[in-house]
Amino acid sequence: MILQALTAYYEQLLKQGKVEAPGWDSRFKVSYELRLGPDGQLLALNDLRQEVPKGKKTVIAPRELPVPHRVKRASGVAANFLCDNTSYLLGADEKGKPERSRQCFEACAALHHKVLDGVDSPAAKAILAFFDSWKPDTAPTHPLLAGQWAALNNNANLVFGYESPDGAHWLATTDDAIRAAWQSAFDTSDADAETARCLITGKEAGIARIHPAIKGVMGAQAAGAALVSFNAPAFCSYGHEQGANAPVSEYAAFAYTTALNLLLADRNCCQRIGDTTIVCWAENAAPAYSNAMLMFFCGGAEARGVSESDLAAALKALSQGRPVSFLDDKLDPNQNFYVLGISPNAARLSVRFFLHSSFGQFAKNLQDHADRLEITRPAFDKRENLSVWTLAQETVNQKSRDKNPSPQLVGDLLRAILTGGPYPATLLNGVTLRIRAEREVTRGRAAILKAYYLRNYPTELNKEVFTVSLNESSHVPYVLGRLFSVLETIQSVANPGINATIKDRYFNSACATPATAFPTLVKLAQKHLQKMTTPNEVHFSKQLTELMAQLPETGFPVRLSLPEQGAFEIGYYHQTQKRYAKKNEEE
């Protein structure tokens, strides 16, 4: 299903003229042009690099150009057509292996003769003349190359260009005759390949032995990684080798890898969260869909010129099945939409999840998730929404050396949000451990507790307790959390400037085993009340009386279950935020 969807996306892009036909890579980083004259002599070395923005500054980067399809190299010699590095196009490099450089140059010359012999094009004849006359030993000291030799050998890719006698010049990759010759060679390249029925197209065709590399996944090898590969006998079916184990035609392998590489290269279609790289696309290939989805999911709307209010309005409308205008395009909630999560695994890619639904259904799942997360927040917290990464960070000790959340947790959380499924238990466990260790219920942790119990255990009691702000629920654990917050406030008012409160010593025991902590805390509060002014004493005594009256006559519970501890923590958070809100109003 993944490969079929990516192939269909490629074909949609091809119809729209946004990608090259099979046999060509749409975007390849090229740094220099080797401009040739009619006799094949090197006339100039042109720098094709350009300034591109990177963060708050600009950097010099290679230009992305369409080039003939690249071969996937391992350790052997394999030349590319028209565009390659100095080892292949010039026969020299700084790797200290002159014999191998000579072999690379000879292989490249043979490839160009095979494709271009007999082609009636001045540019083609110039390229062949270059290979026939070029002396690789002279490359490092050539007057046109010596000044840039270090840069040429710094992972730079070169492409042939041509200048006619009248001064007109163009890249060889744009020459019609050369393009036609390459297309013919590429189309017949699989003539000797093993044929079988392609699993993607359903047609009999030459099978790709090795699939093109996928590049752009953070953490994967720089040379690229494989989504489909077989590199050991244990993975192979009897009598089959490499790609024959899962027959995919050369065309389909090119199509799906081209589509995925384009998505990974477009920051509006791709987002990294933890070790998972997420790519998303609409069936009609309209970029506004993936752009909007990543804003909904990961934030960053204002950086892309969209206000938070407009984004929220668009999400709400789509979740209700209504089309909206967004980024100069119309978003249809019925449009088929895909989300793929992949992670690096040495030279391969692991699929974390692959989801397919209507765009409106994804929007509804995200809206439901946002509604469950909504909770009163401190005045200093200006964030409208909590991203997936922010939620996962709430499970991590920020003082530890490794501040990254579990990759498994991040992947499970992503899937739960996008599918509308139950949140992973590891999310609740991680948050509970951090609350116990730090004795701190942050907005993020309170939001997670609320969302977890409302989605995973949507009982009437949980709907009553886990609300956006303070409520008058008489659920005992919730009341105990409120009571603990009031007791902490009484101590702070009675002892201004105190360094540590009862929260530092008693929070965990009060949350898990109330009967062991609260009797002591209530007695301590009576002493604190005696230190206060009469108005404060009356105010807090009234609060204590009202909350104590909601507790059972049998006294404080001996212990609280994990869900009851969640209610305690929410009660504590609600009451504490109510106190801070009142204080801010008075100021």
Language-model features, listed with the residues they occupy:
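Conserved phosphate-interacting/catalytic interface
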Residues: 1-190, 235-587
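Short metal-coordination and nucleic-acid-contact micro-motifs, chiefly zinc-binding Cys/His arrays
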Residues: 190-196
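Short Cys/His-rich metal-coordination motifs, predominantly Zn2+-binding knuckles/fingers
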Residues: 201-204
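Short microdomains enriched in Cys/His and/or Lys/Arg
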Residues: 209-245
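Short, solvent-exposed secondary-structure capping/transition elements
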Residues: 207-211, 268-269
